[in-house]
């Protein structure tokens, strides 16, 4: 009998509407994404970048540790030996469609040449635009150098 009266007076609907009205006047939890951005952790792993030294020389010494440690095999490196006996890369490609953003390349690098930056907005309509060559990676490093330095400084205590 009680169940019949509850269904007759639409008890469930009234209960649902009171719950809706209760949350209607509370502050919103969601973020209006393109116009508002949530804070990003200093340990966030985003778009890759190659860094340079202060004198403008690239940091990568072509040890190929990042290529060896990459579980997705997204990194391809070719190198040449210079006149002074050191090696530098002639080709450094990362296929961002294969990358799983694990950060192992960054951890394996002995000179902090390859890092994952704060940028996560790099969507593209074509597959070829997501295959980053050395120039694109160096451009990202130059563009994000200050933020990358701050990020590495904050993360240094955990390394």
Swiss-Prot record:
Reported cofactor(s): [4Fe-4S] cluster
Gene3D superfamilies: 3.30.70.3270
InterPro entries attached to this UniProt entry: 4Fe4S_Fe-S-bd (IPR017896), 4Fe4S_Fe_S_CS (IPR017900), NADH_quinone_OxRdtase_chainI (IPR010226)
Record-listed E.C. numbers: 7.1.1.-
Binding site for [4Fe-4S] cluster 2: 70, 99, 102, 105
Subcellular localization, as worded in the UniProt entry: Cell inner membrane
Membrane topology designation: Peripheral membrane protein
Swiss-Prot/TrEMBL keywords: 4Fe-4S, Cell inner membrane, Cell membrane, Iron, Iron-sulfur, Membrane, Metal-binding, NAD, Quinone, Repeat, Translocase, Ubiquinone
GO cellular component, one term: plasma membrane
Cofactor stoichiometry and binding remark: Binds 2 [4Fe-4S] clusters per subunit.
Subunit structure: NDH-1 is composed of 14 different subunits. Subunits NuoA, H, J, K, L, M, N constitute the membrane sector of the complex.
PANTHER family according to UniProt: NADH DEHYDROGENASE [UBIQUINONE] IRON-SULFUR PROTEIN 8, MITOCHONDRIAL, NADH DEHYDROGENASE UBIQUINONE IRON-SULFUR PROTEIN 8, MITOCHONDRIAL
Protein name: NADH-quinone oxidoreductase subunit I
């Amino acid at each position: 009998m009680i169940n019949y009266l509850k269904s007759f007076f639409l008890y469930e609907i009234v209960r649902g509407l009171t719950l809706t009205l209760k949350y209607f006047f509370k502050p919103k939890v969601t973020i209006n994404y393109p116009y508002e951005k949530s804070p990003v952790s200093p340990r966030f792993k985003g778009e890759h970048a190659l860094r340079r030294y202060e004198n403008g020389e690239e940091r990568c010494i072509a040890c190929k540790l990042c290529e060896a440690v990459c579980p997705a095999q997204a990194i391809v490196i070719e190198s040449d030996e210079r006149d002074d006996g050191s090696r530098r890369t002639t080709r450094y490609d990362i296929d961002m469609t294969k990358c799983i953003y694990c950060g192992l390349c960054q951890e394996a690098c002995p000179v902090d040449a390859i890092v994952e930056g704060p940028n996560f907005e790099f969507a593209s309509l074509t597959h070829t635009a997501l295959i980053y060559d050395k120039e694109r990676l160096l451009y990202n490093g130059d563009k994000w150098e200050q933020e990358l330095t701050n990020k590495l400084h904050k993360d240094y205590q955990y390394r």
